Amino acid sequence: MAFAQSGGAGGGGGQRRPFFRRRKTCPFSGPNAPKIDYKDVRLLQRYISERGKIVPSRITAVSAKKQRELSAAIKRSRFLGLLPFVIR
């Protein structure tokens, strides 16, 4: 058969333990979570890269709903001049 795996070299043989990735929780959900506000520059800077881009939610573990709120707050803050568009 063309797709049968052989135990020989290059077969990718050994039994490897699966890597367990812990599920991250959203930092904006919960009882003591901070509110997303366009005036809170210190909070918003944590979700901007060193080049000034918005960090994706798969890295920051922010939920989809809160990521939309966060990006809107960052864009509003940029428009008002509280945050830079580009960091050189």
Curated annotation (Swiss-Prot):
GO cellular component: cytosolic small ribosomal subunit
InterPro entries the record matches: Ribosomal_bS18, Ribosomal_bS18_CS, Ribosomal_bS18_sf
Protein family per UniProt: Belongs to the bacterial ribosomal protein bS18 family.
GO process terms (BP): translation
Entry protein name: Small ribosomal subunit protein bS18
Alphabetized GO MF terms: small ribosomal subunit rRNA binding; structural constituent of ribosome
Keyword tRNA-binding: no
Role: Binds as a heterodimer with protein bS6 to the central domain of the 16S rRNA, where it helps stabilize the platform of the 30S subunit.
SUPFAM superfamilies xrefs: Ribosomal protein S18
Subunit annotation: Part of the 30S ribosomal subunit. Forms a tight heterodimer with protein bS6.
Glycoprotein recorded as keyword: no
Annotated spans, Disordered: 1-26
Keyword terms, alphabetized: Ribonucleoprotein, Ribosomal protein, RNA-binding, rRNA-binding
